[in-house]
Amino acid sequence: MTKRTASIKRQTTETTISLSLNLDGTGQADMCTGVRLFDHMLSQLAKHGLFDINISANGDDIHHLVEDVALTLGKAFNEALGERKGIVRMADATVPMDDSLASVALDLSGRGYAVMDLSFAKNDLTGFPTDLVRHFLETFAIEGRFNLHARILYGSNDHHKAEALFKALARALDKATSIDPRREGVAPSTKGMLEN
């Protein structure tokens, strides 16, 4: 099987990002964005999705940083998936974290789209604006060219809600990116191909 990896560097007047991804990894994470909560959530994605992800990023403000990391990570997933032949393609996961429950369903169809039902009690998670959770997920799905439906079902602790959401995303992505041996070398679509 060909390696399903990607390495991307992105430099703009607002951000500098270096990222590497291995879809068939062991959950190794090395995150250095300068935003501790963001690093923590990205590490959940690697650990619970069994992806090896290394990200070194800095930016002129947190919005530009989160947006550009999402852009770069989405492009890396799209590149690593290649023609998407043999993948399971569609998956979902529901994950609890103490008081909170989050659900993610996705389709690695080659078409980026996001539907969110996220509620947070406050606008800030220890220096991380909660609206950036939504913005990260939407941007990641659009650039990664997959359909994403994400929902926080309930919870009383905003940190737990966000963490359950990232873990659910990781578990769903792990399943959807997995190779189905019954489908090896074949696109999982009646069209005979998926967009990439």
UniProtKB/Swiss-Prot annotation:
The keyword Cytoplasm applies. Pathway: Amino-acid biosynthesis; L-histidine biosynthesis; L-histidine from 5-phospho-alpha-D-ribose 1-diphosphate: step 6/9. Coiled coil: none annotated. PROSITE patterns: IGP_DEHYDRATASE_2. Its EC number is 4.2.1.19. It comes from the Bacteria. GO terms for molecular function: imidazoleglycerol-phosphate dehydratase activity. Its main location: cytoplasm. It is an enzyme of class 4 (lyase). One of its GO terms (biological process) is L-histidine biosynthetic process. Keywords: Amino-acid biosynthesis, Cytoplasm, Histidine biosynthesis, Lyase. Belongs to the imidazoleglycerol-phosphate dehydratase family. HAMAP family: HisB. This is Imidazoleglycerol-phosphate dehydratase. It comes from Dehalococcoides mccartyi (strain ATCC BAA-2100 / JCM 16839 / KCTC 5957 / BAV1). The gene is hisB.
